[in-house]
Amino acid sequence: MSIPPVIFLPIFFYSSFVQAFNAPECIDKGQYFASFMELENEPVILPCPQINTISSGYNILDILWEKRGADNDRIIPIDNGSNMLILNPTQSDSGIYICITKNETYCDMMSLNLTIVSVSESNIDLISYTQIVNERTTGEMVCPNINAFIASNVNADIIWSGHRRLRNKRLRQRTPGIITIEDVRKNDAGYYTCVLKYTYGDKTYDVTRIVKLEVRDRMIPPTMQLPDGVVTSIGSNLTIACRVSLRPPTTDADVFWISNGMYYEEDDEDGDGRISVANKIYTTDKRRVITSRLKINPVKEEDATTFTCMAFTIPSISKTVTISIT
């Protein structure tokens, strides 16, 4: 009887075979909610999106990056793989990138959409970051989407340009990447450019961000007229008027009354209908006035308390009246 030959597999081959056989199936978590639009020929950093959602008890052994349907030779893993870097991207680097995290028992992956565009006036709105400040206030303009580049470098070199208002003393860069604007004016609106100097290896690259600054109309706070106190008697019919004046751009407010945790609104009577609210509105070219009348009929001893007239708007305002009974 012949003895079948014994086949000895190299240890490394056997180990690889077992690992491949036992490798967990990778869970596809879909595409990250945010898309990335970056400039051609400037460094791009993409984050591994599922890193921040992984529980503390999960031990990651490997973080891998790949581009769907293409070679991965343009991808540079950085920060222990939690981010990926492309140094000189071209429009051909646009596409879907996948971050894979795994250990011996678990694997998941999530994709990100990257679009590389050139700098031109025709697509400036596509690549700019809109920021909003209010007229006649102190506002801030921030160089956006640069945290991954500066990391622990709190003294990053960031230069602003592109708008003549940067020469005005009201605009000051007190913190790297942040412009403080004192007494914001309408003509502060426009496009601003900030450039970060990023060093990788022995070479320095420009990272450019364009901010589209919008200035909202000056917010004029509403005014309210309400007496500090009123004197009445039990059994009488009492009406207290609260007058709210609004100026553009604020043209609407929800006006109601509060007392001892109870809310009194128009068309909403209390249990016995003794306390009610009626609102009247009139409008002119320059303002809108809401007169809210709190009606108590008849007055009872329990009404000797405070009632607050509240105008819910931006910004909100309130005043309180005290009812005294003689």
From Swiss-Prot:
UniProt KW Repeat keyword: yes
Keyword list, A-Z: Disulfide bond, Early protein, Glycoprotein, Host-virus interaction, Immunoglobulin domain, Repeat, Secreted, Signal, Viral immunoevasion
Pfam (any one): ig
Glycosylation sites: N80, N103, N113, N237
Keyword Zinc-finger in annotation: no
Disulfide pairings: C48-C99, C143-C194, C242-C309
A Gene Ontology molecular function term of the record: interleukin-1 binding
GO cellular component, one term: extracellular region
Location in the cell: Secreted
Chain ranges of the Ig-like C2-type domain: 24-115, 122-208, 221-322
Main location: secreted
Signal peptide range: 1-18
InterPro entries documented for this protein: Ig-like_dom, Ig-like_dom_sf, Ig-like_fold, Ig_sub, Ig_sub2, IL-1-bd, IL-1_rcpt_fam, IL-1_rcpt_I/II-typ
Annotated family: Belongs to the interleukin-1 receptor family.
Functional note: May reduce the host inflammatory response by interacting with inteleukin-1 beta (Il1b) and thus decreasing the association between IL1B and its cellular receptor.
Protein name: Interleukin-1-binding protein
Primary gene name: OPG201
